[in-house]
């Protein structure tokens, strides 16, 4: 049974199969009856709730409030911002009818042809259009601004090639939509959110990020500028973990959203939008986990510590239960999520493998001999090491160990990124190095033509122009034309 629990395809054999095995065997998610859509199982959803709760708190600390807007968007709304819809047109799911009926010749349920909608409805791929149509009703004066709204919702983008958490036809996310009186204020908002995302991913997910701006080719449809946080996964591929868009006045003009400024003149509103999704779950899984299962950062683990009793008989189990209860209460006083698994239908070895697979940061083993000696065994998931300590010190020790694990897995990820970031000046060398994965820092002449040629020939894209990168000018590795600074190239999810 233990072997069955831990049977994951090794990453060295296939990182793709390893990932899928892990998501399913760790009870995070599974494929549904609807192609491209997933069922997020309770354990996976508990992790998402931790992500959601912390981000929601960070948004509210900066003055944002939550609201909810319709799932359905009239098709005519999307026509108002042409470049915006162009970016999503091939992925849109469309509602054309509003009723079903029984087939008169007995072939089951069919669409009622007489129930065709006067205007087709798009199931939201993103909410800019429906929200800006609403903002037109809300915004009249500078006194109505700024509007700082976030919504937690699901969206649909009809992806053809799907993968659990990373790319699905329906996914969960948050999307922020703000309105401002000035360009400067909107840009400040865009960068503020970028910092929130970066801080969250680094401090809670324990994943180092690079903050940057997208090239025009990679920019969000309808945005003036798209800022992003880029991460590097263990398999050498990049993953975009979040985006924050400065929309300029594009949507305000498309939906005629104007306000009366302090001088009594009418002008268009300035806007931002920003979002992260359940794709963060994919990043969390891929970044830290190993062939034994999940490795979760303690700050996002639904269960941070599991206690497993090892008893010879029922009498000794009762003694262990009593001691474990005291330990649990001490942990709860420190707001540590702890589970005591004294179920008798599975052996300790099975439990060890199960909780290792699920990435519980710390496992405590408490046996009859431990009670006699006043000790307890402590196992940490990130290093798979164990030690025996005094049971009287376990609360403080484990609390400090959780912090150490959080820092250790971040440092491990940071070391990996550093070891897999290279500087390249020659295109032939670039084509060789891109096969090895990782971030490649190379000069780019700033043209879409060069960017597209490199993408076509190598499948590598410009992940971002780093905001805090080296701005030393140079020569484009492909064209020999002048370059303002190095950018990050990588193959990506």
From Swiss-Prot:
Summarizing the function annotation, the protein's role is: Catalyzes the attachment of proline to tRNA(Pro) in a two-step reaction: proline is first activated by ATP to form Pro-AMP and then transferred to the acceptor end of tRNA(Pro).
Organism from which the protein derives: Azobacteroides pseudotrichonymphae genomovar. CFP2
How does this protein assemble?
A: Homodimer.
What does the similarity note say? Belongs to the class-II aminoacyl-tRNA synthetase family. ProS type 3 subfamily.
What name is this protein filed under?
Proline--tRNA ligase
GO process terms (BP) = prolyl-tRNA aminoacylation
Where found, per UniProt? Answer: Cytoplasm
Question: A single Pfam family, by name?
Answer: ProRS-C_1
Entries under SMART domains matching the protein: ProRS-C_1
Enzyme Commission number(s): 6.1.1.15
Catalytic activity from the UniProt record: tRNA(Pro) + L-proline + ATP = L-prolyl-tRNA(Pro) + AMP + diphosphate
Q: Quick check: keyword Cytoplasm in the entry?
A: yes
Q: Which UniProt keywords apply?
A: Aminoacyl-tRNA synthetase, ATP-binding, Cytoplasm, Ligase, Nucleotide-binding, Protein biosynthesis
The record's domain comment reads:
Consists of three domains: the N-terminal catalytic domain, the anticodon-binding domain and the C-terminal extension.
Q: Show the GO cellular component annotation of the record.
A: aminoacyl-tRNA synthetase multienzyme complex; cytoplasm
Q: What is the lineage of its organism?
A: Bacteria, Pseudomonadati, Bacteroidota, Bacteroidia, Bacteroidales
MF terms from GO for this chain are: ATP binding; proline-tRNA ligase activity
């Amino acid at each position: 049974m233990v072997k069955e629990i831990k049977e994951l395809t090794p990453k060295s054999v296939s990182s793709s199969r390893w990932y899928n095995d892990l998501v399913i065997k760790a009870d995070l998610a599974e494929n549904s009856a609807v192609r491209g859509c997933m069922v997020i199982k309770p354990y996976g959803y508990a992790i998402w709730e931790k992500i959601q709760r912390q981000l929601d708190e960070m948004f509210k600390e900066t003055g944002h409030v939550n609201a909810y807007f319709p799932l359905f968007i009239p098709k005519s709304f999307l026509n108002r911002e042409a470049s915006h819809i162009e970016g999503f047109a091939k992925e849109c799911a469309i509602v054309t009818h509003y009723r079903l009926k029984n087939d008169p010749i007995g072939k089951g349920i069919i669409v009622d042809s007489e129930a065709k909608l006067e205007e087709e409805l798009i199931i939201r791929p993103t909410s800019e259009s429906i929200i800006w149509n609403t903002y037109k009703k809300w915004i009249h004066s500078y006194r109505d601004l700024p509007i700082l709204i976030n919504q937690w919702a699901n969206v649909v983008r009809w992806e053809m090639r799907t993968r659990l958490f990373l790319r699905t036809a329906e996914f969960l996310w948050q999307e922020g939509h703000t309105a401002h009186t000035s360009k400067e204020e909107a840009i400040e908002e865009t960068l503020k959110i970028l910092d929130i995302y970066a801080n969250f991913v680094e401090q809670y997910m324990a994943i180092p990020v690079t903050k940057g701006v997208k090239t025009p080719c990679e920019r969000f449809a309808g945005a003036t500028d798209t800022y992003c946080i880029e991460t590097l996964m263990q398999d050498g591929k990049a993953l975009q973990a979040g985006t924050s868009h400065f929309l300029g006045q594009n949507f305000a003009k498309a939906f005629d959203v104007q306000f009366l400024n302090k001088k009594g003149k009418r002008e268009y509103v300035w806007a931002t939008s920003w979002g992260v999704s359940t794709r963060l779950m994919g990043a969390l899984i891929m970044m830290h986990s190993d062939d034994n299962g999940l490795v979760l950062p303690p700050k996002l683990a639904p269960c941070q510590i599991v206690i497993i009793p090892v008893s010879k008989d029922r009498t000794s189990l009762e003694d262990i239960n009593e001691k474990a209860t005291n330990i649990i209460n001490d942990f709860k006083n420190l707001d540590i999520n702890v589970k005591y698994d004294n179920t008798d239908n599975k052996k300790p070895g099975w439990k060890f493998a199960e909780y290792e697979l699920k990435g519980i940061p710390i496992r405590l083993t408490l046996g009859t001999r431990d009670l006699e000696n006043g000790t307890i065994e402590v196992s940490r998931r990130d290093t798979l090491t164990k030690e025996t300590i005094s049971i009287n010190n376990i609360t403080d020790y484990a609390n400090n160990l959780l912090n150490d694990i959080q820092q250790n897995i971040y440092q491990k990820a940071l070391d990996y990124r550093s070891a897999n970031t290279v500087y390249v000046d020659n295109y032939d060398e670039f084509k060789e190095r891109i096969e090895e994965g990782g971030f490649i820092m190379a000069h780019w002449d700033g043209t879409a033509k060069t960017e597209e040629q490199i993408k076509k020939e190598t499948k590598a894209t410009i992940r971002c122009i780093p905001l805090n990168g080296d701005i030393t000018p140079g020569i484009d590795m492909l064209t020999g034309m002048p370059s303002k600074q190095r950018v990050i190239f990588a193959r990506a999810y």
